Every structure is written in C-alpha cells, then in structure tokens.
C-alpha cells in the first residue's frame, strides 16, 4: 500500500476549507471556516481502501447506538513521551500505595515501550490505555502499533484525537474517527479528544471546532458504548493555563447538547465528558464541582503519584456539590 509513502510534511501543506456553523457564546452565525491545521486530502485518499476494509465493513447500522459506561467519574493519566524504567517503577509504586476513591474509573497511558512493565506491576484496579493506535490491522506500517497488539498487552483504552496528534503530527478529523471506529470494533475503549486552539477561541470558534471534531467521531463510530469524550482546549495543555470552571462547563454543556441533537438523548446523558488542560491537585476540586465535568484527562500532574491521587479523589468535591 502507498499509505506510508506520504510524508507528514506533505500532510500539513495546503489548507482546506469547510462551510460550517460558528458559535460566539451560544449564538449561531454562518461563515466559511479555514482549518487551523493545513492538510492534504491525498493522504486520506491513499488510505481510503484501508479504511473501507478495516472499518466500514464492520460498522453497525447508524441507527443502533449502544449506551456508554457506568457513569462513574473518570480520570485518565496521559504520561505522553515521559519516563524511564526507573522513574516509572517509582510512579507505579506510588499508585499502588495510594488510597483512591472507589467511585472512579482510573486509567493510565504509559509510553508504548513501558505498557507491559506498568501492566505487570500495577496491583490495584487502575486500567491501561495506549496513547495512539494504527487505523487497522497490523502489517507493513513501520513505526505503528495495532489495536490487536495493544489488546495483547492488556490495554483496555486508547487515546485518540489528542491535540498533539492533530497539530504536531497532522492527523485529520476523518483519520482520527476511523481509528476510533476500528478500536471500538476490536473491543478497546476510546478516549476521544476534542478542543480548540487559542486563536480559534479568540475568534469565537470554540464550539464550531469542537462540533466538527465530534462529527468526525459520530460519522465513523459503530456505537458510543465505551467512549469517553475529553475536552482539552489546546491553549491550556501544558501551559499552566487552565479554563475556568465556568468556561469548561459551558463547553461541556454544548458538547452534551450536540450529542443529544446529533446522536441521541440517551447517548448524551450517558457519555462521560471529561476535562483536560493543566489539571492539577490545586484546581481539580473546583472543576469537579461542575455538573457536566465527569472527570479529567491529566498530563504532567499524572507523573506525580500523590498529586494524581488527589485528582482522582476530587470526585468527593462533586459528591458534595451534588
């Protein structure tokens, strides 16, 4: 196949544009929106046959929507490209000794090379996620990791659509959606990331960008069972800046409303929508109090066992607020 012959540089060369709806606050207007990440459609034409083989032939009818999870608070730790065998041994030891609230689904996403080490040494109920996966079955795709390989290592989840994959690697909405569909069809849960750039927020395009990203997932997914949506404003990731509780809640409400109108009311009410973007032990409680924030996707703070435990246990703030 010609999939791997297209360079990442060529994927991010020429801007495409799309006609869509812009939201400023909650008011709607129509405009022509230029994509913030310029990509070439040829990349997706090259993989189109692979998409059809790996996803479309296995899709359930769009009218069939399976309900998502348990409704528990959900906290994921994205370790990104960090750690050594020694530091991860210490981090896992801290997690094993931490007291974590029972009413929380806890997931950690180590780098690929440490998944087996983490899986074999965790003693509690913490589940394992991958940070990415290939769009279909394994084969001649140098450097990629298949969902089947992740399952073989014991991964229950995979993070897809993270802003660093979108804006650094150049992955497009359609490509991400197809990866999510394949993972779900293989029985791996998806943490589906969405979020806007700073210039998009300042231009009043926050909702529009998030809706486009959601639509790409909705168009591809066989169901919303085992899907967690993670809203991560790009301007807040790793910057120390964090959306205020009100800002985060506003977007979470809008995301849930979009799911209600475009997927189903049941999916909207069942799907957990979590927040990510410089979440730490100091701000997690106030964020957790927001009605539509169902948990967190944590970056840097997840590399510190005690602080990550504090974030997991912020579910108590939600219980008090309720």
Swiss-Prot record:
EC number: 5.3.1.1
General remark: In plants, there are two types of TPIS, cytosolic and plastid.
Record flagged with keyword Glycoprotein: no
PANTHER family named among the record's database cross-references: TRIOSEPHOSPHATE ISOMERASE (PTHR21139:SF2)
Gene3D superfamilies xref list: Aldolase class I
Residue range of the transit peptide in the UniProt record, numbered on this chain: 1-67
Organism: Spinacia oleracea (Spinach)
Enzyme type, top EC level: isomerase
Pathway(s): Carbohydrate biosynthesis; Calvin cycle
Keywords: Calvin cycle, Chloroplast, Isomerase, Plastid, Transit peptide
One of the Pfam families matching this protein, by short name: TIM
GO BP of this protein: gluconeogenesis; glyceraldehyde-3-phosphate biosynthetic process; glycerol catabolic process; glycolytic process; reductive pentose-phosphate cycle
Family: Belongs to the triosephosphate isomerase family.
Active site per database record: 162, 232
Ligand binding (substrate): 78, 80
Record's GO cellular component terms: chloroplast; cytosol
One GO molecular-function entry: triose-phosphate isomerase activity
NCBIfam families the record matches: tim
The protein, known as: Triosephosphate isomerase, chloroplastic
Coiled-coil parts of chain: none
Catalytic activity: D-glyceraldehyde 3-phosphate = dihydroxyacetone phosphate
Cellular localization per UniProt: Plastid, Chloroplast
KW Protein biosynthesis (keyword) present: no
Complex formation: Homodimer.
């Amino acid at each position: 196949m010609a999939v791997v012959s297209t360079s990442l540089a060529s994927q991010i060369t020429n801007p495409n544009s799309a006609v869509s709806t812009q939201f400023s606050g909650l008011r709607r207007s129509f405009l022509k929106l230029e994509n913030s990440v310029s990509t070439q459609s040829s990349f997706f034409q090259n993989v189109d046959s692979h998409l059809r083989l790996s996803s479309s032939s296995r899709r359930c009818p769009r009218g069939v929507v399976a309900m998502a999870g348990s409704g528990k608070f959900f906290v994921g730790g994205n370790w990104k490209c960090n750690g050594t065998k020694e530091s991860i041994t210490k981090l896992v030891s801290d997690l094993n000794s931490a007291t974590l609230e029972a009413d929380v689904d806890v997931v950690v996403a180590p780098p690929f090379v440490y998944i087996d080490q983490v899986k074999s040494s965790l003693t509690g109920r913490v589940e394992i996620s991958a940070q990415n996966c290939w769009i279909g079955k394994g084969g001649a795709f140098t450097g990629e990791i298949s969902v089947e390989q992740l399952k073989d290592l014991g991964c229950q989840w995979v993070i897809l659509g993270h802003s660093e994959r979108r804006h650094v690697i150049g992955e497009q909405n359609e490509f991400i959606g197809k990866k999510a569909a394949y993972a779900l069809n293989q029985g791996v849960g998806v943490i589906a990331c969405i979020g806007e750039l700073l210039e998009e927020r300042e231009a009043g395009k926050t909702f529009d960008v998030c809706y486009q990203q959601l639509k790409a997932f909705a168009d591809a997914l066989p169901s919303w069972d085992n899907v967690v949506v993670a809203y991560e404003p790009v301007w807040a990731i790793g910057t120390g800046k964090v959306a205020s509780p009100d800002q985060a809640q506003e977007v979470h409400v809008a995301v849930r409303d979009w799911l209600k109108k475009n997927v189903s009311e049941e999916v909207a009410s069942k799907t957990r929508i979590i927040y990510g973007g410089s979440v730490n032990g100091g701000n997690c409680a106030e964020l957790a109090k927001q009605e539509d924030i169902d948990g967190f996707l944590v970056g840097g703070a997840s590399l510190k066992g005690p602080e990550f435990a504090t974030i997991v246990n912020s579910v108590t703030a939600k219980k008090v607020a309720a």
